[in-house]
A protein has these predicted regions:
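N-terminal module of bacterial RNA polymerase sigma factors
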Residues: 1-28, 35, 183
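Internal acidic/polar
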Residues: 81, 89-111
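Conserved RNAP core-binding helix
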Residues: 21-22, 30, 40-56
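C-terminal edge and immediately downstream basic/flexible tail or linker adjoining helix-turn-helix-like DNA-binding
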Residues: 5-9, 164-183
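Sigma70-family region 2
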Residues: 12, 51-66, 86
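Helix-turn-helix DNA-binding module
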Residues: 123, 127, 138-155
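DNA-recognition helix of helix-turn-helix
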Residues: 148-173
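Hydrophobic-face residues of short alpha-helical interaction/recognition segments
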Residues: 29, 33, 58, 71, ...
Length: 183
């Protein structure tokens, strides 16, 4: 959450506040944009455009919820514009309409926030545990990981166990929330 010490307007023309907003929302907005464009690089490019426009406009917001809603809507609209433009360029626009309900928009917004939260929790792991776990997720065996990282297989197992325990503990509440939402 943004530092809400100051009460009043959130002004994006202030460099410090803009940087704070950028760092707070970029990851979640990237996952949100990827739901539309299906390409991380394109999603990042679109987000850069959105943040440049926000900086140039220097918008002011009454509170963080107003800012957050605005950011998600602008990113969604930017993604939809990109999709339409891409379709036109490829001359496949015939019959293409983007239909989206408010419910699916909120659902996608929540999913993007959840992915960002999971990513943040994963980043909390110690480097050694995270590296071993990533290689395991890539489908590598204990032996392959041990050879690549020059550590013992027992150490690999210990890192994976520690990572699993930490992730299980940190994600339990999130899992219950996701099940409640039906995600």
């Amino acid at each position: 959450m943004l530092n809400e010490i100051e009460v009043g307007l959130i002004c994006l023309s202030e460099r410090k506040k803009f940087k704070e907003v950028y760092e707070e929302y970029f990851t979640a907005l990237k996952y949100f944009a990827m739901r539309y464009v299906k390409d991380e690089e394109v999603a990042c490019d679109l987000l850069q455009d959105v943040f440049v426009k926000l900086w140039e406009k220097g918008d002011r917001f009454e509170n963080e919820m107003q800012l957050k809603t605005y950011l998600y809507r602008v990113v969604r609209n930017h993604c939809l514009t990109y999709i339409r433009d891409t379709q036109r360029k490829e001359k496949r626009m015939e019959g293409f309409e983007v239909e989206e309900t408010e419910e699916s928009f909120v659902h996608q917004m929540i999913e993007a926030e959840i992915y960002a939260l999971i990513n943040d929790i994963f980043e909390e792991l110690p480097d050694a545990c995270r590296n071993v776990y990533m290689k395991s997720l890539e489908g590598k065996s204990h032996k392959e990981i041990a050879e690549e990282l020059h550590i013992a297989i027992t150490t690999i197992k210990k890192h994976k166990t520690n990572a699993n325990n930490y992730l299980r503990e940190r994600l339990m509440g999130l899992l219950c929330f996701m099940m409640y939402l039906g995600i």
